[in-house]
Amino acid sequence: MVLLAIVGVIVYAVMVWPVNPTRMKPAESYEQLRDTVEKKTDIRVPGEDLLPWTVTERQLRMDGPSRLAKVSGFALSGTMERGGVAFSAEVSVGVTGVVGDLPSPWDVYRHVPVYLFRNQGFYMAQLYIDGSEYIIQLHYPENVTLPEEDAAYVEDALQAACHNIIDLNEG
């Protein structure tokens, strides 16, 4: 009986021991990421051509750090360039609720409000569809001031990406 209890404790410890402390798990390919996320959640994964970028990393978001954790979203990371400025970019989604007050929408497409946050070195578009929070972030060096034309290009790319995500979920 004692041996059974010891084995039970060991099995439990192995199952709940953190294997993904960041709650992110690498995906081998875009296809594996899309298939896994769409099979195990209600989240739709946009194509890698969502932004004018090069995707460098694909990750599954997990709902916890243990072996028993379930897929709860994804993150695609990459780089893009405009006007000689290098941007790091990330598209991610997870199940969440709206927290705090949001500003007035930057855009409303198909009745879905899109919020834009920007600061020196940073752009973030955020939208909520069926309980999932989609976030697109672009970071660039804070000491760089984007010319108006490049800033408009970035905002147009963000808006097109948000519309693409909304269309994907409406279809």
Each predicted region: which residue ranges?
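A short, solvent-exposed beta-edge/loop patch
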Residues: 100-171
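Compositionally biased, low-complexity segments enriched in small residues
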Residues: 11, 36-37, 160
